[in-house]
Amino acid sequence: MKKLLIFSLIFSLFLTGCTNPTSGGSETTDTSEIIESTETDITTDVTEAPVIENVDYKSNFNKNSHLIDILGETADNVVVSDFSINMALSMALEGAEGNTQKELENYLNKTKEENLIYNKQLLEDAKNVRNIKLEVANSLWYNKTLEVKDTYKKLLEENYEAQIENVDMQDPATVGKINKWCSDKTHELIPEIIGSTDNIESVLINALYFKANWLEEFYEGATKKETFKGSKGDIEVDMMHSTEATYLENEHATGFIKHYYDGYAFVGILPKNEGAFNLTDLDIEGLIKSQTHKYDVKVGLPKFKVEYETSLLGALHQFGIKDAFDPNAANFEGIAENLFITDIIHKTYISVDEIGTEAAAVTAITMDNAAFAPEQKEVKDVVLDRPFAFAIIKTDNNNILFSGKITNIEQ
């Protein structure tokens, strides 16, 4: 079986996924025009799926792929929520000024004004789903001694629907309150985001919860024990099988699209070359634009569940966000005086089975007062290692909620 790539996005919900666990790749059979992605022959009626509009994916897909590649340098499995990360950084941007503002705008690829309008629309769109669960929550927790500007609090409440909490960061109970909020907003999938409030003056948090059934569920009787060639050796997995209508192929990869309800979809992507790979080399944008309904696509997707946690400081520093993390250069005067970012904690969860997908993410931006900044510790990114990636996308835009790379699957 080829190593697989599952690159899944959510508000651009797309998960790249698995194929042929035994044949070594996809091939076209001229006589029947069947794209073989697995050995098992599943005869299923394939519903004509809508084509994802060729909107400009380039900036979002390239940025997201690069982020996963950076985090994947030290990990097998990487799962990130671009949606959650961007929403949390957007709330920080609202209080940023000077060069700190410019660096955040460059990463988000929007001005402060454009970003505000954009995120308000995302929150409205999340409310308009009918057959899936897509829940977005924001909050600001700040120390009782910190003088946060009323204009900033009002902006978060009115535009990000944020919950504002003035708390005692010296009280150990505050940690429990913050973690309970995260647990509640993610339906207990992410029960904890911080372990201590020492040296923390404020925390900006985005929480995201997604649960969707497949438009056409996998037939449970077709799920078989098959071999997945992971980075740490072969492992037996529960491989789901179906026949899909949308085929993807470019110079670097093949793939398929399987739809959820309400215009979300899972995109499975299999690199043509076996072994380690970088997402940035696969041209995800071009692959999505290559979609065709000329074939029946026989696919295999392993059931999997992944929990992931990392600090984003090192990766975002490589994207040019520097002043925000420097106590001597950070400018968040729109929030309060002398604040700088001490950490950006990102946790995700995803589970994929015959019924559908459940996923959650929490991004917490912790800030401290530069006047009392402790000595900066070395930042370590804790992630997994290779060979497949994933994302979840909405089929009419390019907003990325979740994406990742999976190389080992625990049973």
Give a label for each model feature.
Residues 1-2:
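N-terminal hydrophobic targeting signals that begin at the initiator methionine
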Residues 346-348, 354-411:
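C-terminal soluble interaction/assembly domains
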Residues 76-78, 254, 387-390:
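Short loop/turn microsegments at loop-to-beta-strand junctions
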Residues 100-102, 275-278, 308-310, 360, ...:
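Extracytoplasmic/secreted cell-surface and envelope-processing proteins
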